[in-house]
Amino acid sequence: MKGYRNFIIIFSALFILYVIAELNKPKPVDWTVTISKNDKNPYGGYIIYNRLKDLFPGVQMRSYYLPVYNQLNNIREKNTAYMILTPSFDPSKYDYREMMNYVRQGNYVMVSAEDFGKAFLDSLKIKTNSRFSMQNKDSSKVNFVNPLLKLEKAFTFLSFTMTQYFSKLDTAKTTVLGVNDRDEPNFIKIAYGKGALLLHAAPICFSNYFMLFATNSMYTARALSYVPPGISKIYWDEYYKITNEPSSTPLRFFLKNENLRWALRLAMAGLIIYVL
């Protein structure tokens, strides 16, 4: 019995040391595109979220974690903005209807996504496309149409190619605001009622990494300048993002980490051997 006791003590000590080592091991960089307000990784949105109050002095910030319909169906305001910066945006028909009612009242919605839902695009009579190139490119360029905002040599971003663009537009209602390196529209404005819908096809332009590269923070600020500076509130979406929230329980933390998951299995096996 004493031998078993020594075994479990030694095994437990080794297990604890292993867990401590794993917890202190440097974490690999997460390159997932989230544009989430709490994400400080390269493609998170920590910087842009915390800069919004500088770009819109005095504005009230509110974060939402539910679909557009659930958030906007009770809002009857003017002069506010709803920002959805996400890799993919595919709202339901109810979300779309509520969003456009919100815009019609005199508000602005800005959606930046690389992938838009087909039903959403069809409702607006627009289409997107992704340019394929035989060349192995490791950088992209974006710029504005307005001479007062555009750079002579465009805004450049390394390590990420931005190939999505709007291939078909409803020209009666749409204004092209920005283009990619082939002068294909990737930033447009659709007037509706007393407000407008701003669609942007390169959400990476609002990421931490993009904004810290060269003068690219200037691009982000200028893109947001199409939202009226005197707005009273900004509703920031977190629902449509890919987030990496911390585990809510110790068990989930162990199960998410492969090494700790195996350590937990070994510990359980050791306890079973001890009991037997």
Residue ranges, per PLM feature:
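Long alpha-helical segments found as membrane-embedded helices
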Residues: 1-56, 60, 72-91, 95-100, ...
